Structure formats: C-alpha cells, structure tokens
Amino acid sequence: MKLNELHPSEGSRHARKRVGRGTSSGFGKTSGRGQKGQHARSGGNTRLGFEGGQMPLFRTMPKRGFKNINRKEYAIVNLADLNKFEEGSVVDFEALKAKGLVKKQLSGVKVLGNGDLNVKLTVKVNKVSEAAKSAIEAAGGTVEVI
C-alpha cells in the first residue's frame, strides 16, 4: 500500500447536492421543493410540533407537575466508597473531592448504606441514612451531621 493508493471506503463519501443547475440534473427549476406553497418559499417552514393547524399533541395533554425552585440536590456517596479512606481519617466534602468521590458542591453530601464499611472513620456530611449511620457506628466510627 502506498500513499497515492489511499482512498476512502466505498459509500463513505457523498457528492454535494447541487440544486438549480438545469433540468437534466434532476434538481433543476424548483430545486426539489415541489411547486408553490409554504415549503417552496425562502424561509418558509413550520415550527417544531406544528400539525397543519390541527391542535398539536402537546396542547391536547394536561399540564402536570412543577419545578421546585427550592429543591436541594445532594451528592451521593455509598458506604462501599468510604473504604478508600485510611483508618481513623476524617471524611468531609474536601476529602471526598480529593478522592474523586464527589465532583462538585451541590446542596451537600449524603451518605447512603449501599455496601459494607470495614474502616473506622469520622464522617462529617450534610445528610446520612439510618442504615449508613448504624453501619458507620458499628465499624467504630462517628457521624457528624453538619
């Protein structure tokens, strides 16, 4: 194989569609836009969801729910993740971020009880589930809700 023998795979490249270049091209005169009408005009097109004047589907459905502007979102950390820390260390947001367990400060950090904890830790977080709290204390650690 030589550099001058390189070529793209069959069917991977498409010729540009040149419209309005004579009737024998297949896209002359009306350039594939049909005869007259909204879609034949320049800039003439319907908005997203428009159904020709019929009541659109999204307007036939009832409104539901709302976005709570006071919503709090917590970064989730499971017990199994806390095994990455050394015995007796303090686990807070900075420590979790340094280990790559949380990426950004949301409304805080919540520890959930998924997995097993094998090390004694001091955990300082915003929220903790009952299962996680009992597991941390069973391992000899302490939980401080800040």
UniProtKB/Swiss-Prot annotation:
In this chain, the stretch annotated as Disordered covers 1-56
Role noted for this protein: Binds to the 23S rRNA.
Which family is this sequence assigned to?
Belongs to the universal ribosomal protein uL15 family.
Task: Alphabetically list the UniProt keywords.
Answer: Ribonucleoprotein, Ribosomal protein, RNA-binding, rRNA-binding
Please list the residue ranges that the record marks as compositionally biased, kind Gly residues.
Answer: 23-35
In what ranges is there compositional bias, type Basic and acidic residues? 1-13
Could you tell me the Gene Ontology terms of the biological process aspect for this record?
translation
Q: Which Pfam families is this protein grouped with?
A: Ribosomal_L27A (PF00828)
The record describes its quaternary structure and partners as: Part of the 50S ribosomal subunit.
**Can you quote a single GO CC term?**
cytosolic large ribosomal subunit
Give start-end ranges for the coiled-coil region(s): none
Is this entry keyworded Cell cycle? no
Protein name, please? Answer: Large ribosomal subunit protein uL15
Recorded GO terms, molecular function? rRNA binding; structural constituent of ribosome
Q: Which organism is it from?
A: Lactobacillus delbrueckii subsp. bulgaricus (strain ATCC 11842 / DSM 20081 / BCRC 10696 / JCM 1002 / NBRC 13953 / NCIMB 11778 / NCTC 12712 / WDCM 00102 / Lb 14)
